[in-house]
């Protein structure tokens, strides 16, 4: 799912609601509600009354937000049967039923039979719930929250009772001016874990993907529109702000790529190991028939043979439909459950949910550019591309032999040039085990056992200098193993940096290295395993971002600052990280931030203030000031869309700071938990960190003081980023980022 922020008048901008009214205290047998009267909640947020569209004679009984123009209706009683008589009124019967009389035309709507009561009244609660209450016991006999329309308010809920089959769903209006039941229904599924599903008639229209039980969406208003869009919005000032809309993209429509198809940026593709079912139709853009497996699986339960199937991980996935929940305590257990079940086609271990497996065709799968989950799909081992026919192997022997002879000569010359250059340009230390003070040297066979011989099912991510694997030692301790790619021309220097630096650095906000392995050409780093992956997987994921509210984000900002302050001032070595960004901030099981990936770090003496190096590296500044703004806004630094304009996040932050003090920069998903003074302070600090003159930027000691006290801060000047962004885009790129040098993309530490 994708979150889209923009100001909106929402739904009823062009529709005029007509009503002239005065308030009454409540509804009882002696005091009905007539046209021209309203019933308000005690907190003044909601109002019940009669309304019509564009001077029409058709009147509806509804609930709306009081005092907000244009009026936004959240519940309608008589959706299918408007009243036309000017004497229409809402009364309460002796058996506690609400009755809407259409003058001499009789009853237009009824709440239905309720429990026996000797006296009752109707009230509008502070949550927007119309309730019928027993006068003697005080119990609720009927409530509108049990009969939802097209809108869900914060304290109402979608529901599916497995025992009775009873459902509470949202049903769309026929049009913006006709509240009768429309074509779309929003419901939750009976699956475990559940997911939201929009139906158009009997066919799925949009699906959210599985929800974690811990996720709590405290949002003011959720609507299923007459066009089938799910919209989540909040009122801010005089406007409605649309926090989320779905479907918003062609990939959001259910099953657009068919079985075993995967939608990537509006284009359908087949999973690895699959091909289009009908190639000619696929080429014409008719993708609904999907894909089929290229190589049939030959599964043997409990098989450990090399010719058995293997699991191929696919990252950034919206999990497909038709999953089943399996009781597994961790990703390894999930892998084993699927491995030993021949009908299991894929598995995914999702934080906050657990283990999901698929025994049916993959349907409605989407791959995002960031975020999402890792889906490991079962493929025949031949899909690895490692098994060649004997004829091909035989025909290649002569050519290969000749290649090796010529290659050996070229390799020898290349090694001489590398060593010659390295002696002048590389760091003044050799890659030897004894250099790793304080770290434990692991045996290669120990790491191979822990990572299942570096199996693909254990692979967490792929970076510029190699791959990262999850492992489990014999004592049960989980580890992350960074395996240097032998084809990397720069990787050894970065590898040596990480060993020498991290082995001597100890701080709760730095990732801890457990040891290394140096055997032959193999170079491995062994880290502590981070259960919650990296910070970017939360910030830029429309579902996970809701799990980190403002207090947690502020704690993360302070934790990063503490780690950087330690590197700059308090550690035995003075270290500049040089590649700090949210993807290099890992989160432990308690969501504590830990700085990782020291491949580009540089040591300097206590008297040195310049980092002299020819290598172009990552982000500018001490704490990567953009990180503060990304954590606050939940948006990536490179481009930030606001309305019809596209600008850098820093440019938008500066404009927001000048106009409103920066509060509208805050990620709207955490607005309910924010502390405005802290937010404004963090934005001001972020702008100070990107000042053009170094003297205007705070050092790490000043940064820590700014984040932990309430002392007055200097006023920031307009950043150079803002001045030059439009005038010279190539120049601004040099200023803003050189993140092409990112050294690892780790999805699951």
Swiss-Prot record:
Disulfide bonds join 251-263, 257-268, 334-355, 338-344. It is found in: Cell membrane. Residues 247-280 form the EGF-like domain. The keyword Electron transport does not apply. GO terms for molecular function: ATP binding; calmodulin binding; carbohydrate binding; protein serine kinase activity; protein serine/threonine kinase activity; ubiquitin protein ligase binding. The active site is at 579 (proton acceptor). GO terms for biological process: recognition of pollen. GO terms for cellular component: plasma membrane. It is an enzyme of class 2 (transferase). Residues 454-721 form the Protein kinase domain. Keywords: ATP-binding, Cell membrane, Disulfide bond, EGF-like domain, Glycoprotein, Kinase, Lectin, Membrane, Nucleotide-binding, Receptor, Serine/threonine-protein kinase, Signal, Transferase, Transmembrane, Transmembrane helix. InterPro entries: Bulb-type_lectin_dom, Bulb-type_lectin_dom_sf, Kinase-like_dom_sf, Pan_app, Prot_kinase_dom, Protein_kinase_ATP_BS, S-locus_recpt_kinase_C, S_locus_glycoprot_dom. It is a single-pass type I membrane protein. Its EC number is 2.7.11.1. ATP binds at residues 460-468, 482. Residues 414-749 are cytoplasmic. Residues 1-25 form the signal peptide. The keyword GTP-binding does not apply. This is G-type lectin S-receptor-like serine/threonine-protein kinase At1g61460.
């Amino acid at each position: 799912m994708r979150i889209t922020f923009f100001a909106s008048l929402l739904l009823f901008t062009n529709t005029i609601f007509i009503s002239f009214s005065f308030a009454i205290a409540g509804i009882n047998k002696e005091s009905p509600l007539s046209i021209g009267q309203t019933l308000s909640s005690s907190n003044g947020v909601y109002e019940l009354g009669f309304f019509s569209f564009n001077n029409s004679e058709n009147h509806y009984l509804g609930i709306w937000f009081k005092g907000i123009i244009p009026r936004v209706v959240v519940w309608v009683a008589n959706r299918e049967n408007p009243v036309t008589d000017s004497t229409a009124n809402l009364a309460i019967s002796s058996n506690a039923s609400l009755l809407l009389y259409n003058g001499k035309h009789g009853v237009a709507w009824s709440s239905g039979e309720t429990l026996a009561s000797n006296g009752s009244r109707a009230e509008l609660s502070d949550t927007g719930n119309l309730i019928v209450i027993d006068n003697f016991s005080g119990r609720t006999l009927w409530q509108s929250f049990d009969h939802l329309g097209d809108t869900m308010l914060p304290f109402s809920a979608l529901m599916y009772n497995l025992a009775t089959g009873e459902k509470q769903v949202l049903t769309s209006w026929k049009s913006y001016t006709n509240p009768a039941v429309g074509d779309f229904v929003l419901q939750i599924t009976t699956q475990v874990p559940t997911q939201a599903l929009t139906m158009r008639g009997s066919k799925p229209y949009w699906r959210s993907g599985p929800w974690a039980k811990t996720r709590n969406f405290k949002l003011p208003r959720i609507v299923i529109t007459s066009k089938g869009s799910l919209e989540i919005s909040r009122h801010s000032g005089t406007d409605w702000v649309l926090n989320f809309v779905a479907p918003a993209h062609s990939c959001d429509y259910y099953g657009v790529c068919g079985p075993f198809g995967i939608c990537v940026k509006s284009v359908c593709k087949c999973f690895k190991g699959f091909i289009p079912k009908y190639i000619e139709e696929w080429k014409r853009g008719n993708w609904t028939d999907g894909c089929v497996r290229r190589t049939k699986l030959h599964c043997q339960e409990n098989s450990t043979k090399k010719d058995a199937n293997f699991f191929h991980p696919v990252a950034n996935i919206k999990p497909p439909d038709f999953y089943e929940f399996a009781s597994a305590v961790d990703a390894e257990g999930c892998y084993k459950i699927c491995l030993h079940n021949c009908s299991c086609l894929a598995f995914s271990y999702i934080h906050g949910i657990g283990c999901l497996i698929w025994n049916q065709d993959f349907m409605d799968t989407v791959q995002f550019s960031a975020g999402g989950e890792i889906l490991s799909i079962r493929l025949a081992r031949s899909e690895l591309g490692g098994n060649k026919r004997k004829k091909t192997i035989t025909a290649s022997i002569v050519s290969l032999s000749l290649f090796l002879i010529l290659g050996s000569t070229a390799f020898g010359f290349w090694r001489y040039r590398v060593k010659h250059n390295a002696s002048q340009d590389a760091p003044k230390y050799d890659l030897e085990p004894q250099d790793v003070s304080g770290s434990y040297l692991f045996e290669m066979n120990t790491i191979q056992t822990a990572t299942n011989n570096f199996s693909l099912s254990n692979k967490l991510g792929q970076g510029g200098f190699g791959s990262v694997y999850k492992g489990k030692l014999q004592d049960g301790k989980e580890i992350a193993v960074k395996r240097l790619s032998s084809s990397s021309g720069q990787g050894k220097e970065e590898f040596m940096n990480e060993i020498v630096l991290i082995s001597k650095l100890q701080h709760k906000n730095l990732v801890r290295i457990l040891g290394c392995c140096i055997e032959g050409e193999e170079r491995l780093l062994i880290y502590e395993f981070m259960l919650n992956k990296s910070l970017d997987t939360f910030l830029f994921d429309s579902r996970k971002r809701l799990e980190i509210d403002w207090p947690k984000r502020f704690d993360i900002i302070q934790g990063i600052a503490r780690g950087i302050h330690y590197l700059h001032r308090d550690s035995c070595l003075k270290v500049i990280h040089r590649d700090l960004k949210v993807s290099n901030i890992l989160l432990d099981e308690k969501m504590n931030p830990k700085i990782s990936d020291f491949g580009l770090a540089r040591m300097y003496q206590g008297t040195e203030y310049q980092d002299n190096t020819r290598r172009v590296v990552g982000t500018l500044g001490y704490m990567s000031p953009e990180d503060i703004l990304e954590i606050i806004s939940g948006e990536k630094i490179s481009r930030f869309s606001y309305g019809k304009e596209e600008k850098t996040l820093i440019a938008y932050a500066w404009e927001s700071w000048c106009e409103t003090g920066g509060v509208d920069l805050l990620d709207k998903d955490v607005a309910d938990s924010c502390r405005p003074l802290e937010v404004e302070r963090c934005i001001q600090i972020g702008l100070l960190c990107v000042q053009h003159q170094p003297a205007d930027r705070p050092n790490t000691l000043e940064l820590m003081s700014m984040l932990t006290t309430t002392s007055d801060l200097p006023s920031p000047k307009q950043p150079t980023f803002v001045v030059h962004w439009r005038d010279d885009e190539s120049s601004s790129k040099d200023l803003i980022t050189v993140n092409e040098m990112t050294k690892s993309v780790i999805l699951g530490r």
